[in-house]
Amino acid sequence: MALPEFSMRQLLEAGVHFGHQSHRWNPKMAEYIFGARNNIHIIDLAQTVPLLHNALKAVSDTVAKGGRVLFVGTKRQAQDVVADAAKRSAQYFVNSRWLGGTLTNWKTISASIKRLRHLDEMLNSGDAGSYTKKERLTLQRERDKLDRSLGGIKDMGGLPDLLFVIDTNKEDIAIQEAQRLGIPVAAIVDTNCDPKGISYLVPGNDDAGRAITLYCDLVARAVIDGLSRAQGDSGYDAGAMAQPLREELPVVAEARFQGLAGPRGVADDLKKLTGVSGAIEKKFNDLGIFHFWQLAELDHDTAHKISEEVGLPSRADAWVAQAKTLTEAE
């Protein structure tokens, strides 16, 4: 096993280089910005490549020494990816709302985890039938609520040794708690974020779905590398196992935008985007686009293809930037 390899081409294809609108930047990120195009900051991937390698090495080294990695990503486009990467690498995750004190008040969190385990036992035991329908429903709701917040860390058994974070602005409480306890943080830091206090900073787009998938896949594979090294250092012969460890390689399919069959709840007013009329909004809807967050997740090439289909190809980058702003304002 070895650290996962990646290329600058992969980063470009995933849209890692796209930052936020230039007027929404954090000046502390100036040294990591290559320039601006259409009022969108472009991240210097020549710096991202070695910094990402350093972060992956830190992850692998932490796990090789027996440490635990906690994946943190609670924004909508990161939730499923973060959970999948953590599960695939036998680590831990928080992908719902971060509960204040998750790290700094671990004793209380442990009590809640104990309650979650107890509810699991109650609902899965043969005695579950002794409860009334209303009692079972109440217990199930309590169990589901706890599982959303704590399900990814219920088997952690103690504080993590390293945090991997998507979006340092959104996860600022988690980062502050880690800093108070001296837990190192590896994080994807966009152009609107403050890099202060991040142990292993990786300048990159923290909004695009493809970029988030790439980061999480690389970190998961770095964890697997660390686990393999730990087994080798202990003299354990993984090759002698009846069922040897396997690294699950992700199936990389050609990126293809998939619209929604209909809006999720109330559709957003897409006419708030510059140059979007009622007719163009209808074209967006025909393509399955009803919400700003859908546009905010688009990579560069897909955004241009969609803007061509609605008749305004020159607006692609501006629409994505505006959609990000409007999504964050929700």
Swiss-Prot record:
<dbReference type="InterPro" id="IPR001865">
    <property type="entry name" value="Ribosomal_uS2"/>
</dbReference>
<keyword id="KW-0687">Ribonucleoprotein</keyword>
<dbReference type="GO" id="GO:0006412">
    <property type="term" value="P:translation"/>
</dbReference>
<dbReference type="InterPro" id="IPR023591">
    <property type="entry name" value="Ribosomal_uS2_flav_dom_sf"/>
</dbReference>
<protein>
    <recommendedName>
        <fullName>Small ribosomal subunit protein uS2</fullName>
    </recommendedName>
</protein>
<dbReference type="GO" id="GO:0022627">
    <property type="term" value="C:cytosolic small ribosomal subunit"/>
</dbReference>
<keyword id="KW-0689">Ribosomal protein</keyword>
<comment type="similarity">
    <text>Belongs to the universal ribosomal protein uS2 family.</text>
</comment>
<dbReference type="InterPro" id="IPR018130">
    <property type="entry name" value="Ribosomal_uS2_CS"/>
</dbReference>
<dbReference type="GO" id="GO:0003735">
    <property type="term" value="F:structural constituent of ribosome"/>
</dbReference>
<dbReference type="Pfam" id="PF00318">
    <property type="entry name" value="Ribosomal_S2"/>
</dbReference>
<dbReference type="InterPro" id="IPR005706">
    <property type="entry name" value="Ribosomal_uS2_bac/mit/plastid"/>
</dbReference>
